[in-house]
UniProtKB/Swiss-Prot annotation:
Matches recorded under HAMAP family: UPF0297
Domain of life, source organism: Bacteria
Family: Belongs to the UPF0297 family.
Pfam families: IreB
Protein name per the record: UPF0297 protein stu1959
Source taxonomy: Bacteria, Bacillati, Bacillota, Bacilli, Lactobacillales
InterPro entries: IreB
Amino acid sequence: MGFTDETVRFNLNDGDKDEISNTLTNVYRSLAEKGYNPINQIVGYVLSGDPAYVPRYNDARNQIRKYERDEIVEELVRYYLKGNGTDL
């Protein structure tokens, strides 16, 4: 399978955006409560796909695994750009 010069569209359902945001908040809190650095752990999970970066505490691991990592990245980028004044 090769790459193409054509731009591919990627779309995330609007309902999933809120659910992903809520999940990330819950996972962040669970990581913090267990004494981990939540940002480092979430980045580790997103980059590697290894669920061991997220504890089972408060069902955080199962919650974050409901979503594909590219969906999580899309929500993070959207949130960042919106928070920095980009009109989305």
